[in-house]
């Protein structure tokens, strides 16, 4: 009788373990403000591949300003293309726009977006021109059943009303308030996503303002624009930024229990 009882308890324990939420780890690799610093690229592929070798669920993300800052890239036959070719080769998944994406005008940027083999999202730029594509505000990726929403925003504070740059680069474009758009799409996506990420080129000061309001609903903010190294938790949201010039790559580890976020942490890996 006791033997049967022990066997029953073992069976119950095994069943409970089998029914328990599965624990998985999702890794977001992030860059921002690379500014064409292709001289710092050699260590990037090895860092990305090392992560992919050890983690099964990896997403590669960029928060804007991919060119303007290195003559080899900026004076190439197609300015900026060496960086885009590298990003395509590495298998980037998602990116948003930075202010320097507009440096060569809308038609040029439209062609560059067409050449990008990854999703480009920006929730606060609308276009009524035929030279610039209407970008999606977000994308939802599925990684092993985990639904990850990425919303993109770009600064409109320096223009004012648009990113810093030549006025002619922004004709026919409107840049609604990025914080308002970030909140709007967070509310829309949160019910259908297990993980929600804001890919922001507002600057960490504006990111902090957004999170301090307590209504963001994001799990992680991958930031850019202000060239800072940022790793802080605000109201339950992890705010990150990797600095500039491809000196670092950000590694955000999201621990999942079932389809819920159980914890997040961040570290920088030096590439310089």
Question: What annotation goes with each model-predicted range?
Answer:
Residues 19-271:
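Acidic, metal/ion-coordinating pockets
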Residues 1-8:
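Bacterial N-terminal signal peptides that target proteins for export
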Residues 10-19:
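Hydrophobic h-region of N-terminal signal peptides that target proteins for export
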Residues 8-11, 149:
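Small side chains
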């Amino acid at each position: 009788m006791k033997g049967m009882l022990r066997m029953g308890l073992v069976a119950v324990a095994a069943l409970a373990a089998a029914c328990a939420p599965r624990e998985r780890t999702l890794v977001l690799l992030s860059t921002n403000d690379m500014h064409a610093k292709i001289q710092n690229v050699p260590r990037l592929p090895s860092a990305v591949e090392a992560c992919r070798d050890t983690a099964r669920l990896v997403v590669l993300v960029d928060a804007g300003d991919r060119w303007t800052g290195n003559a080899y890239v900026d004076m190439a036959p197609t300015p900026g293309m060496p960086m885009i070719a590298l990003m395509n080769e590495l298998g980037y998944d998602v990116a948003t726009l930075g202010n320097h994406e507009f440096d060569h005008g809308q038609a040029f940027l439209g062609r560059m977006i067409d050449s990008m083999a990854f999703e480009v999202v920006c929730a606060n730029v609308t276009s009524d021109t035929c030279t610039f594509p209407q970008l999606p505000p977000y994308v939802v990726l599925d990684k092993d059943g985990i639904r990850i929403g990425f919303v993109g925003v770009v600064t409109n504070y320096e223009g004012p009303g648009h990113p810093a740059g030549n006025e002619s680069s922004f004709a026919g474009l409107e840049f609604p308030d990025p914080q308002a758009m970030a909140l709007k799409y967070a509310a829309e996506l949160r019910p259908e996503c297990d993980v929600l990420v804001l890919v922001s080129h507002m600057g960490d000061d504006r990111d902090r303002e957004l999170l301090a309001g307590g209504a963001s609903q994001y799990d992680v903010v991958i930031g850019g624009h202000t060239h800072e190294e940022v790793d802080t938790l605000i109201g339950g949201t992890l705010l990150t930024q990797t600095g500039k010039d491809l000196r670092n790559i950000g590694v955000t580890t999201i621990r999942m229990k079932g389809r819920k976020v159980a914890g997040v942490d961040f570290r920088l890996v030096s590439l310089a």
